[in-house]
A protein has these predicted regions:
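Amphipathic alpha-helical scaffolding segments
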Residues: 129-135, 139, 146-152, 340, ...
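Well-ordered mid-protein domain cores that form the structural environment of catalytic cofactors
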Residues: 67-126
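Short, conserved secondary-structure transition motifs
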Residues: 163-185
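Catalytic metal-binding acidic patch
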Residues: 113, 120-147, 164-169
Length: 952
């Protein structure tokens, strides 16, 4: 082929002729044919058939050809006549195929192009085929939809031939108007870029069939007058309009497009960095050199000038030349070196190997370039041995790549802001792309960094050694990762792959980055820990079942929503013996208690440490280590917090514990606990629901509840402290839910809380000989309890019911307009029937029984020091704080004692209490909770009865 021919000049003012236009068209077609031949030769025999028959399957709607849907699907490519090679390829696919004359039917399709890297230096075996299929502008929506379904079917067919095919269906006039149908997907830039994509199309596309680009015929110096020139060519019939397709000019790239295009290249760069680095730097180059012509213009200028050599016009050669000229100077040498490495690795052609001879033109061209760069054979060998790259190599390279990608994004974002332009990318698309970038590159606490985004084929190691730092002396508590360390003594001289504060993080990092596989040999030097190879093997099995490798990218739908946890894996007691302190004493089990959170007679909590691994909807993997304080409760609190924002879909919780003897029991108990806690808080896929969840663990009680969307917990050191806390006032009704193992020695209390209801005052009692236990659950779920002597079953509830009746009567007087808001009283007896504790309803028949004696009332008052004191009325006799001061209680006790006719000691019961509305000095309480009245009643009664006993 002739590389240089005479230049062509078109002067639209002086006049043009059809013969010159045909020569110009044929010159572009000559370059086009060279690229098609190169693209064809790079494919395998089976893959070549896909490229050969692609125009034919859209030109004909033949049922024997791939992609056929139905007889109504649009078909026919303008001015297309299949070659003998194409017909033969079709017959190889379908023996019944025969070419029929369609007559003069108007074709539905204008043109078909292949664009991107095929036929270029950058094409590799992994490259895909991006096809533009352009339909006529008046095609109905139903026909367009049919073409899109046919394209999708062809994509699946091509996949069976080892070809990744993407066919984009659109109309040229819609393209010019910016009405693209597609959104951002894996292979579509959506709204992110228009002119940049058109610039790439004009300099890389291969015409497959149909109309030719009108852009070919417009001189590069006339790009600004594109529309006028195009109209002259058509109106004066220099060309037939149906022979050409018009995508419009690319005089320059609008500034507002740079941000969208930059974000898009970052999106692509997550999985294919080499190509994206080149494109991102080209975008930056365009943005910084706005006065210089675009590469598409340079390509067209070269063809007009007479250049037809495919090497010189290769899009990647031209791209590199532009970037090399722009990045001149020692201060940017590192960026230029990254560009060269990216181009070499994008080509995927290892020059140090003999088998590249089948890629003669690419090998020759690439060899010329690396020779010009002054690369040594050592550099080539390093790049050609990508499959032998280690984690350390990839980490360094990834850092360089991420720095370059983020540098480009920040620069473009800054430029877009400075020019005050709206980015040429929809808000939805930029949000979507930003989320993917965040998920891939953003560092945050606990996140497991993915170090190999398509940089090396594999980082798998044959042998990994995990060494506890105490093995090397000192009291350090971290872990070191080595490779091929057969002799532990060599650790002092071997490089460390990675250091970590805990073993689980090191294991998860190795697994997620592919260093650790089932075939990797493991070595453990545990030092002061008890980790073992068997524990690591079990951990690897748990990780493999929990998380796929490699971690796939998140789907568009997931990125369009807020991030949420999908599932959690809890690794319990990694490298820890939870019974070490018991074993030292020769103790293993001192009672029949099997609960792992209150094990044996010592009520030992066997959960010492937890490593929580979370896999979220953006496909980020993170690890949180809990080893100090109340580890299980802290972990539970964090899981609850992560669910609160999206309770409709509860994350899965898997638990693994290796510990010999009790490992499976510990894992089962922890898994039960998480399920039991999540269920009531988020029942029905909503929540968090208002409740208080009580867990008994390690001889203590933990009470979990939400404040809005924030979970919190209170640790209580004793049963008495728990009961005091449950009696405290609430802002709204909060029922008490007990964990399945909590307070098993208090079945009556569990039955009380199970029977509690909102907007009621419930009195529960249980008689035990001459003593009774009473509980009152008030209108907001606060629980108050006390013991009382039983002198008569009939009179047992009378004092408290009389007290509550007086309280309710006073509330009714205040709420005359809304009597329904005042809670009534219901009574229940706690009984055991058929081995089950339950609350049985008892009518309030005793409330009207008269009691001997007189009314004892207390009226609370606040003095200057804000201490709450009480004036007490015994019948008509008043005992005031002002008169009696600290001697008020003894005086009342003495008075009551003086009125009794016998020496028998029996308790005094208050019949009513008035509390001030400023009981809490910080707020004004319109309605004081029943539990608060019961508390002060109990305090006063206890004090009075103690003094009565003394005055005997």
């Amino acid at each position: 082929l002739t590389a240089h021919v005479a230049p062509i000049s078109l002067d639209f003012e002086e006049g043009i002729d059809r013969k010159t236009l045909r020569r110009l068209r044929d010159r572009f077609l000559l370059v086009n044919q060279q690229r098609w031949d190169r693209a064809h030769s790079a494919l395998s025999y089976r893959q070549q058939m896909v490229l050969e028959v692609l125009p034919l399957v859209f030109h004909l709607n033949h049922p024997a050809l791939p992609g056929y849907l139905d007889s109504d699907c649009p078909y026919g490519l303008s001015n297309y006549k299949p070659s003998p090679a194409t017909i033969n390829a079709a017959r190889r696919l379908a023996r019944t195929f025969s070419l029929k004359d369609e007559g003069k039917r108007k074709p539905d399709l204008d043109a078909m192009f292949l664009m991107g890297s095929p036929g270029t230096l950058g094409h590799s075996v992994a490259s895909d085929l991006d096809v533009w299929l352009c339909h006529r502008r008046d095609l109905p929506e139903r026909g367009i939809g049919c073409l899109e379904r046919k394209a999708a079917k062809l994509t699946r067919w091509a996949e069976s031939f080892g070809v990744e095919l993407h066919v984009f269906v659109f109309c040229a006039s819609d393209w010019r108007a910016g009405r693209q149908r597609a959104e951002v997907t894996g292979e579509n830039c959506g709204s992110a870029q228009h002119f940049l994509l058109l610039d790439e199309f004009y300099r890389t596309s291969i015409h497959l069939a149909g109309a030719w680009p009108m852009w070919w015929l417009i001189p590069p110096e006339q790009e600004a007058n594109y529309d006028d020139c195009m109209r002259k060519l058509v109106d004066f019939r220099f060309v037939r309009a149906e022979d050409y397709i018009d995508f419009g000019p690319v005089p320059t790239i609008p500034e507002e497009e740079f941000l969208g295009a930059g974000v898009w290249q970052l999106y692509k760069g997550i999985d294919a960095p080499w190509k994206s680095i080149l494109k991102l730097l080209l975008i930056e180059c365009y943005a910084r050199t706005t006065g210089e012509p675009l590469l598409s213009s340079e390509f067209k200028r070269a063809v007009f000038r007479g250049e037809t050599d495919a090497d010189s016009l290769d899009p990647y050669v031209m791209l590199y030349g532009r970037l090399e000229g722009w990045l001149a100077g020692p201060e940017v040498a590192s960026r230029l070196d990254l560009i060269r490495r990216s181009l070499y690795l994008k080509a995927g052609l290892p020059l140090t190997r003999s088998e590249v001879s089948g890629e003669q033109w690419r090998a020759r061209l690439l060899r010329q370039m690396v020779t010009r760069w002054g690369w040594s054979e050592c550099i080539l060998a390093e790049l050609d041995e990508r499959q032998r790259w280690r984690a350390e190599d990839v980490v360094t390279l990834r850092r360089t790549i991420v720095n370059e990608l983020t540098h480009g994004y920040r620069l473009l974002s800054k430029m877009a802001r400075e020019h005050g332009q709206r980015a040429a990318i929809s808000a939805n698309d930029i949000n979507l792309l930003g989320r993917k970038l965040y998920a891939a590159f953003q560092r945050k606490a606990g996140k497991i960094e993915q170090i190999n985004p398509g940089l090396a084929p594999s980082l798998a190691e044959e042998n990994l050694a995990f060494h506890h730092q105490s093995e090397q002396g000192g009291d350090s508590d971290g872990w070191l990762l080595y490779r091929d360390l057969e002799d532990p003594a060599d650790a002092f001289w071997q490089p460390v792959i990675r250091r970590s504060g805990n073993l689980a993080e090191l294991m998860v990092w190795c697994y997620c980055n592919g260093l650790l596989t089932r075939s990797t040999r493991l070595n453990v030097r545990s030092g002061t820990s008890i980790a073992s190879v068997s524990e690591l093997r079990e951990m690897l099995d748990a990780l493999s079942a929990f998380l796929p490798f490699p971690v796939p990218p998140a789907e568009r739908e997931a990125l369009s929503r807020g991030v949420r946890p999908l599932r959690n894996l809890l690794l319990v007691n990694v490298g820890v013996d939870p019974q070490a302190h018991l074993t030292e004493k020769g103790l293993h089990k001192l009672s029949s208690r099997h609960d792992s959170l209150g094990f044996s007679g010592g009520r030992e909590n066997l959960v010492i440490s937890i490593d929580q691994i979370t896999f979220n909807s953006w496909h980020e993997v993170s690890l949180q280590h809990y080893a100090a304080g109340d580890t299980l409760i802290q972990c539970l609190k964090n899981v609850l917090a992560s669910v609160a924002a999206n309770p409709a879909e509860l994350p899965g919780v898997q638990v693994h514990c290796h510990n010999r003897g009790h490992g499976s029991a510990i894992a089962r108990r922890v898994q039960e606990l998480f399920a039991d806690v999540l269920r009531p808080f988020f029942a029905g896929g909503t929540g968090p629901h208002p409740l208080r969840y009580v867990i008994e663990m390690d001889r203590r009680y933990f009470l979990l509840q939400f404040n809005g969307l924030e979970p919190g917990f209170v640790a209580l050191e004793s049963f008495e402290a728990l009961m005091e806390y449950l009696a405290m006032p609430q802002e709204r009704y909060l029922p008490v839910v007990f964990d399945r193992y909590a307070l098993q020695e208090e079945p009556a209390l569990r039955a009380v809380c199970l029977a509690s209801e909102p907007d009621n005052i419930q009195v529960f009692y249980r008689i035990l000989g001459d003593q009774a236990r009473l509980w009152v659950v008030d209108e907001l779920g606060s629980l108050f309890s006390w013991e009382q002597a039983v002198t008569s079953r009939r009179h047992l509830l009378v004092p408290v019911l009389r007290f509550l009746d007086n309280l309710i009567e006073r509330r009714l007087l205040r709420h005359t307009d809304s009597a329904g808001v005042v809670a009534g009283v219901q009574c229940y007896e706690i009984v055991r029937r058929d081995g089950t504790w339950r609350a049985e309803y008892r009518p309030e028949s005793d409330s009207g029984v008269p009691l001997p004696g007189f009314e004892v009332q207390a009226v609370g008052i606040h003095e200057g020091d804000s201490r709450l004191r009480f004036d007490i009325f015994c019948g008509d006799q008043e005992f005031s704080v002002q008169e009696y001061g600290d001697q008020l209680i003894p005086a009342v006790a003495h008075y009551i004692r003086s009125l009794r006719q016998s020496d028998e000691v029996y308790p005094v019961y208050l019949t009513d209490i008035h509390l001030p509305h400023d009981l809490d000095p910080r707020v004004y309480q319109q309605d004081i909770q029943t539990s608060q009245y019961l508390y002060y009643r109990s305090v006063l009664e206890d004090s009075l009865n103690r003094h009565l006993a003394r005055t005997r």
